[in-house]
Regions:
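Active-site neighborhoods and metal-handling regions in enzymes and metal-associated proteins
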Residues: 1-259
Length: 259
C-alpha cells in the first residue's frame, strides 16, 4: 500500500482482503498485470484469449476492454482473440434468487423516486428539477446512483428516444416522459413512465396513454419462456398500430414505425 496515496484517497483493500471478498485464490495488483500476462504467454501454450468487448456506452468508439483486446492482438499475433460478450450476456440473463431480490430492491427505490417526483411535478418546473426530485429520493434511500442518465423530456422532447439535456420548462397541458432507474448493489431498474405535468390528462392525451398502457399489458400477458424480444416487440407494435388506426393517427399498421 502507498501511505501517501491512502492519505489522499482513503484506505485501499489489501491482497488478503481482496481474496476473502472475491473468493479467488490468486489476486494481484493491477500494475503487475502486464508482467504476469507476459509470463503466461511466453511459458504456456495459449491458443485463445477471451475479452468482453461489448460496448457499454453508445457514444464510445472504443471502451477499455476493446482497447485491451486490440493491444493484446498486436502484441501476441499468434493467439486468437475472441469475444466472450455473448457468453457473458447469456449467463447474465439467468438470475438466482439473491439477484432477483436485489433487482426488486432497485425497482422499489425507483418506484419511491417516481412518487417523490410526481408529488412535486407542476407547470413551470424545469425538467432538471423533476430529475433532481427522483435522484434525490433514490440516493437518500440507499441507491448506488442511477442505472443510466435520467431522461426527463416534456412536450416534444418526450419524442426523442435518448433526450438527456433535461433543460426545458415543463409547461401546462403537456406530458413529461421519464426513462430512468435506480441502481442498487450493482443491479439496475429501468422504467419508462409518462405523466401529465398539471396532474390531469387532456382527452386526447388519455386516449393515447391508454393505447400505450394496453400494449404494455398485452406484452406482459403474452410473455413466456422461449419467446424472443422480437416476438414481444411485434405484439406491442400490433396493439399500438390498432389503437392509432382507431384514433385516426395512421391508416395502416406498417405506418406505426414512421412517427
Amino acid at each position: 500500500a502507498d501511505p501517501d496515496r491512502e492519505r489522499w484517497m482513503g484506505k485501499k483493500m489489501t491482497v488478503d482482503e481482496a481474496k476473502a471478498q472475491a473468493q479467488i485464490e490468486k489476486v494481484g495488483f493491477i500494475d503487475t498485470e502486464k508482467s504476469v500476462l507476459n509470463r503466461i504467454m511466453t511459458r504456456e501454450d495459449v491458443y485463445n484469449v477471451y475479452f468482453d468487448t461489448y460496448r457499454h456506452d453508445i457514444d464510445d468508439l472504443e471502451d477499455y476492454n476493446m482497447m485491451k483486446a486490440r493491444e493484446f492482438a498486436q502484441k501476441y499475433p499468434g493467439t486468437r482473440v475472441k469475444d466472450c460478450a455473448p457468453i457473458i450476456a447469456e449467463m447474465r440473463m439467468q438470475k438466482d434468487e439473491d439477484e432477483v431480490s436485489l433487482i426488486r430492491e432497485a425497482i422499489k427505490l425507483t418506484d419511491n423516486g417516481l412518487k417523490n417526483l410526481m408529488a412535486h411535478l407542476q407547470p413551470g418546473q424545469m425538467e432538471y428539477q423533476a430529475q433532481a426530485d427522483f435522484e434525490y429520493s433514490i440516493k437518500r434511500n440507499g441507491a448506488d446512483g442511477v442505472s443510466f442518465p435520467t431522461i426527463a423530456g416534456s412536450g416534444i422532447n418526450g419524442t426523442m428516444l435518448h433526450y438527456v439535456t433535461n433543460e426545458c420548462e415543463c409547461k401546462d397541458n403537456t406530458l413529461l416522459l421519464l426513462d430512468l432507474g435506480a441502481k442498487y448493489k450493482g443491479y439496475c431498474a429501468d422504467i419508462t413512465r409518462t405523466y401529465p405535468v398539471n396532474g390531469k390528462f387532456t382527452e386526447k392525451q388519455r386516449m393515447v396513454y391508454e393505447v400505450v398502457l394496453a400494449a404494455n399489458r398485452a406484452v406482459a400477458k403474452k410473455a413466456k419462456p422461449g419467446m424472443t424480444l422480437r416476438e414481444l416487440n411485434d405484439v406491442c407494435k400490433k396493439v399500438l398500430a390498432e389503437g392509432c388506426i382507431r384514433m385516426g393517427l395512421i391508416e395502416k399498421e406498417e405506418e406505426i414505425g414512421k412517427y
